[in-house]
Design a protein with these regions (language model features):
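Membrane-interface "cap" regions at the ends of multi-pass membrane proteins
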Residues: 1-65, 172-175, 194, 281
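Transmembrane helix-loop boundary segments of multi-pass membrane transporters
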Residues: 2-7, 70-83, 143-158, 178-187, ...
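Extracellular loop-to-transmembrane helix junctions
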Residues: 2-27, 33, 70-106, 110-111, ...
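Loop-to-helix junctions at membrane interfaces in multi-pass transport proteins
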Residues: 2-4, 41-46, 50, 67-81, ...
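Residue-level recognition of pore/gate-forming positions within transmembrane alpha-helices
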Residues: 15-18, 58-59, 86-90, 130, ...
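Juxtamembrane interface elements at the cytosolic ends of transmembrane helices
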Residues: 16-35, 65, 96-110, 167-170, ...
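Hydrophobic, small-residue-rich membrane helices and short re-entrant helix-turn-helix hairpins
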Residues: 37, 106-114, 176-186, 261-291, ...
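Helix-loop-helix module between adjacent transmembrane segments
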Residues: 56, 78-173, 229, 233, ...
Length: 383
């Protein structure tokens, strides 16, 4: 993709905005103490809109934009099944899980396991989750994020990895969860804005000058097969979708774990002002999940209807950015992709720091550590 000067200015402005907001909200107020609750749980003072936005920002990464658009191109709207089931999962977690977690006043999920079982279970799961987060989640977000940026924007892989890690680390290490959550609100605006703009332009082009509604109508006619939610067994994408038995069975195990027991998702709800704020935040996140197909899958179907000359379906979203978006808007779209990566990285870094500090450092290495030392350990580990 060719990047114009205007696009570059828009992207740099986005980076500066995120850094400035992150550093600004990281400042300690007058009389504010330097303790674990303030750093890891934002002083237990997050509002519902910050919780919901931060959950979505943590969940979505750049490879999801590219991958789900590619699935929309190859399979169609049926891929939205995963997103819609996730929205229902968020409702269940909000209703049944959140009141229990907040009543316990825990920092981490291993702490909950200690209360429910014993210290041995907590320790085993703390080390397990640290290994998964560090060696699987964090590395995959960095690699796939840098790979996506390399494919879309031509940024070298190594430079992308270093730049993304440094960008996410600057404000997340300094400001803790408060900085992560409040900058996530801005990230979500870019995510939704970039996705909506791409969808609008694609549908407008399909409308042949008659508007977006006409474009969507034409899309439904030109790609009618892409709007089936249940596929025939002969369809090449049949095995990529969950069957009925999976939807009512095994998928819920993964769904409820991810939204209800996954530290870097549930930590936002643990930082809520109250149970109602946490529940409303998760409801807000569920509402946004319902919109994700509009932002991600529909553009892929539009690329199919526009006869995009692709070698692989995953090229659908990059093709739309390269060929449809005007100067200036490309910068917003690139900022949206970067926002998806940076928000996920910052959330993962903060959660790794939280689990190690609260479940290992405070429990075994320095059980008598004062709050200032616990806070310092969290910041040092993030570095």
């Amino acid at each position: 993709m060719n990047i114009s000067t205007i696009d570059l200015i828009v992207f740099i402005a986005y980076c500066l905005l995120i850094l400035l907001v992150g550093l600004f909200v990281s400042r300690r107020g007058k009389g504010e103490t330097q303790d674990a609750s303030n750093y890891f749980l934002a002083g237990r003072g997050l509002a519902w809109w910050a919780i919901g936005a931060s959950i979505i920002a943590s969940n979505i990464s750049a490879e999801q934009f590219v991958g789900m658009s590619g699935s929309g191109y190859a399979i169609g709207l049926a891929m939205a099944t995963y997103e819609w089931i996730a929205a229902l999962g968020l409702l269940i977690v909000a209703k049944f899980f959140i009141p229990i977690f907040l009543e316990k006043k825990i920092f981490t999920m291993p702490q909950f396991l200690e209360e429910r079982f014993d210290r041995r279970v907590k320790t085993v799961m703390a080390f397990f989750w640290l290994a998964v987060f560090i060696f699987i989640n964090l590395t995959s977000i960095l690699y796939l994020g840098a790979l996506t940026i390399e494919n879309v924007m031509g940024v070298p892989m190594l430079a992308g990895i270093i730049g993304l890690a440094a960008f996410a680390g600057i404000y997340s290490i300094y400001g803790g969860l408060k900085a992560v959550a409040l900058t996530d609100v801005i990230q979500v605006v870019f995510l939704i804005g970039g996705g909506l703009i791409t969808t609008y332009i694609a549908l407008d082009m399909l409308g042949n000058g008659e508007g977006v509604i006409s474009g969507f109508t034409n899309l439904c006619h030109q790609a009618e097969d892409k709007f089936h939610l249940i596929l025939d067994k002969s369809h090449p994408g049949y095995m990529d979708l969950p069957g009925v038995s999976v939807i009512i069975g095994g998928l819920w195990v993964a769904n409820l774990y991810y939204w209800g027991c996954n530290q870097y998702i549930i930590q936002r709800a643990l930082a809520a002002k109250s149970v109602s704020e946490a529940q409303n935040g998760m409801l807000f996140a569920g509402f946004i999940k319902l919109l994700i197909p509009l932002l991600v899958v529909i553009p892929g179907i539009a690329a199919f209807a526009l006869d995009a000359p692709l070698e692989k379906s995953d090229e659908a979203y990059p093709w739309l950015l390269s060929n449809l978006l005007p100067v200036g808007v490309k910068g917003i779209a690139f900022a949206a992709l970067t926002a998806a990566i940076v928000s996920s990285l910052a959330s993962m870094m903060n959660s790794i720091s939280t689990i190690f500090t609260m479940d290992i450092y405070r429990s075994y290495l320095r059980p008598k550590a004062v709050e200032r030392d616990v806070d310092a350990c969290g910041r040092m580990l993030g570095q």
